[in-house]
Amino acid sequence: MKLAKQVPLYYYLILLASTAIVIGIQWDISWHSTIGRDKLLSPPHLVVYIGGIICGLICTFIVFKETFFNKISEGVAFWGFKAPLACWICIWGMIAMLTSAPFDDWWHNAYGLDVQIISPPHIVLAMGIFSVILGSCILILTRKNLNPSNFIYDILYIYASSLILVQFSIILTEYSFANKQHSYEFYKVSSILYPFVLIAFKIPSKYKYAATYITSLYMIHRMLIVWILPLFPAEPLLGPIYREVTSYIAPYFPVLLIIPAIFIDIIYP
């Protein structure tokens, strides 16, 4: 408990906001699948954008603190301000996320409904989200290296890494449908991206089974979404309606990454 109190509050807040972003994205996909076209400020969009704004504001606070109150700051200088590189990554991510909002609204008005997750506005949004979560992860990792005796930072780092893995799995949704899992495309994409992410985020951790812990949190997160979303009522509002539904459509069961993660932990020193 004492070690937990030594961690500044904004580290917990930035992870909470990052979690809200990832949950909001999955809610938004379910919203599109269930209800149909949504407005710019629909509830899932608000959750995503507010999460990004909170992360950006926290990093802006760190920028001002390091610039004006830390005279020996060795952070990255930009326009006269100084802060850790992770903060600049987060702030850039927030700007990209907010830029994607009017871009996505214009895209829908110009070209109609999305037929797939990966579209130009969504790529901008995904880059912004990835930058925000990656910046949060690097920020925690930096603090972890400066405080190696405080294992709380290790736990926070593992959790932040799991959010990045969830984000990658969302991007690969259209390659991971049940019928696609018998195709060459699924194995090609999964075999390249997932091991890269797992090994990249396992290396900085001091835990032997870091990849297993990361994928365990990823599985828990994805399964909770699968179980919780259908508990809330929703119905299609965009015709033509070919299938009546009365609750949110849940995503497919997640890819079992925990199994290869165990082998990675055993093989990788």
Specify the residue positions occupied by each region the protein language model found.
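Membrane-entry segments of alpha-helical transmembrane domains in multi-pass membrane proteins
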Residues: Q6-L15, G36-L57, F81-I89, V115-G128, ...
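Alpha-helical transmembrane segments of multi-pass integral membrane proteins
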Residues: L13-I23, C87-D104, M127-L134, D154-Y175, ...
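Membrane-interface helix-loop-helix junctions at boundaries between adjacent transmembrane segments
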Residues: V76-I89, P102-A160, T173-S183
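Hydrophobic cores of alpha-helical transmembrane segments in multi-pass inner/ER membrane proteins
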Residues: L46-F64, I123-I140, K188-K206, Y252-I267
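Membrane-interface interhelical loops and short amphipathic "cap" helices
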Residues: Q26-L46, F103-I123, I170-S190, I228-T246
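Juxtamembrane membrane-water interface segments of multi-pass membrane proteins
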Residues: M1-Y12, W27-D38, L57-L85, A110, ...
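Anaerobic metallocofactor- and corrinoid-dependent redox/one-carbon enzyme cores
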Residues: I225-P269
